[in-house]
C-alpha cells in the first residue's frame, strides 16, 4: 500500500464510517479510521488465504483454547505488514502522533496469563509459517478483571474492553451454530444455576479476528464464540408486565461468555465454567465438521484433513463430543468413531499442580450432557479392560487410570479423558515432560509411551522483540539484517560481538534509553519516581505461592535490614524491584502477598535510611501492553518457582530476548535457557525438583528460622508488625504458611541460596562490561525459544501439516472479492 492510497483510505473511513471531518475527530476516532484502513489491506490477504485453503484443501489445524491473551493489535499488524513507517509519515503530515493513537486501543479482554499468551504466540507463528489454522475461543464481554490497588489490597473491577466495538472483529451471524444442553438455566441466589427442566438451545455467534503472519502473505482466523439465546425476546412475558422475564433466557445465555474463568468458589461459578467449556467445544466442533463436510470430506478421511489441538484440559470435552457426532450424527460404529477421534485430537498439558488437573462432577454431566457421560462411561469401560489386560491384578493402578474418580465426589478426570482420547500428549519443557512421564502421568506413559512427547514453549519475536523493543531490534538488524525476525536462531552468529567493546557500548545505550523511557512513563502514568541508574529487577507473573513472590520479598527484607544496619557504607548498586501480576479473586493468600508487597514498598519509601538505595513497586493491572513497556528496561528476570512446579514459563523467554539476566531455579524452560546460553550467564540457585520431592518427609522450616539469622530477622520484621501499617497481625496467615503449615513451597529452604545469588547479581552489576557480556549472550542465544521453532515441532511431529502459501492468483481473487468456490466451479465444471 503506497502512502497516497493509505491516506485516501484513512480519510474515507474517517468521513464515511464515522461521519466526522478531520478537524472534529479525536484520537479514538482517528484510531478507528486508521484501523479500518489497515483492515482493508488485511482483508484482501485474508480472502486470498481462505481462497488458497479452499482450493488446495490442505490439512488444517484447529486450535481450541479457553483464552487468548492478544494485547493490542494495530501496532503488531503494522509491523507484520511492514507499513509502520508509511503510516507514521502519513499521520505526521496531518499533525497526528501515531503513538497516541496506538495508546487508545484497549488490550483485548480474552485472556489472563501464560496459557492465553502462548496461544496468541502460536497463532502468530502459525500464520507466519503459513500453516492453515483456525483458532477457536470464547468472545468474552469483560474478560479477566481489571486490577486496582486500594490500601495495598487487590480490588477487582470489570474490564469493559468492548465499551466501544472492537474494529478488528467481524460478527458472522450467518455462521452461527447451536449447542444443546439437556437442562434449563435459571437465576437464583445471585448466579446462574442448572435445573432439569427442559432442553435448552444456546446460540453461538462467531466473531472473527485476523491473524496476520509476518510479511502479510498469510492471514489466518481466530474465531470466538459469543453465547446468546435463539429466542431473544418473549413478547408475551413483556405484554404481561414481566419485563425481566421477557429477556430472561437471553440474559442467562449471554452470561456464558460474560467473563473469563468465573469464580469457582460458588456452585453458580462452577456451573458457569462447566457450561463455558462445553459451549466452546460444541460450537467449535460443529463449525469444524460443517466446514469439513462442506468441502466434500468423507468421514473416513477426517483425521487426514483435520488436526484438533486441545490447549490444556478446558476443551477436553471434545473427546466425548466428537464421539457423539460420529456415533449419532455420522452413524459410524464405535471402533471407527474411536479411531477417528484419537487420530484427530492432540492434547497439551500445561501443569504439574494436582489442583489444576480438572475434574467435573458426574452429576453435572448427567444433568446437562447425559449422552456425553454415557459415551465417557463406555470409553472408560473399554479402556480399563485394556489396562486390566496389560496389568492384571493391579487394582490400584486401574483406579488411578480410570476416567471416573469415585471419591470424595464422583467426577470425570478431564486430564485422563484428554490423554485416552488423543493420539498425542505433550509437555511444554523438557523437565515438565519428564515429570509427566515419571510422576504425574506415569501410569499412562507406561501404558501408552508412544503418545507422550515434549514441545518446549516459545514466544513470538515479532511482538516481544521487534515491536516491544525497537531500539534493540534495530541494533540487531544493523548487525545481521532482518533474517532473525523469522528465524531467531540466526542471532547466534552475533555471539562474538559480546567481546566487542563498541557493540557492548551501543547495547548499554539502548538499555539505558529504555530505562529512561520506562521511568518517564512510570512518572506520568503512576506518579512514581524511580532512578533509571538503579538496577531494574522484575518479577511479573500470576501471583501464586509456587511462583514465590514471597521468596523475593523475603530477600528484599534481608536487603532492607542490611542497608539499615550498615548505613551509607553499604556496598552494592541502588536497586529497584518491580512486581506485577493478578491473584485469583478467591485466592486469599495470594491477595495477602500483594498486600505485603505494597506495604513493604510504602515502608521502604518512607524510610530515609534506605532512600536512594532501595525501592519496591507493584505495577497494577499487568497485561500485554504493560509487559511490552517494561521488557526493554529489564535487567534482572526473577524465575524463582519451586523446582518441579513450573511447567515451562514464557516470561522467562521474553526477558532473555530483551537482555535481562535470569535469577532462577532449575525449573521449567529456565533449565533449557541456561543450557543454551551457558549456566555461567545465569544466576541459578536452590533445590532441584528431585531434592524438593526427596525432602517432603523431613523438611522443617523452623530449622532455617533458628539457624539463619537473616531469615529470622526478615520474618521477625513481618511478625513484629513493621509492615502492618495499622493492621496488627494482618500478615499472620503468611507466617503460618511458612512456619506452622510446613512451608510447602520451600521458601525458607531456598532463601539462603537465593540471597547468595542476589549478592552475585549486585557484585556483577558493578562491572558493567562483564554484565553486558552476559546480557548480549542471553539475547543472541535465545533463538531456540521462538514460537516458530515450537510450532514447527507440533506441525511435523504431532499434526502432520505443511505450509500452504497463497499464490498471486489467490491474492488477485481476494482483491476482487471472487470466492474460491466460484473459481473451483469454473475450473472443474458442474
Listing of model-derived features with the role each one plays in the protein:
Residues 1-818, 824:
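A conserved ligand/cofactor-binding region detector
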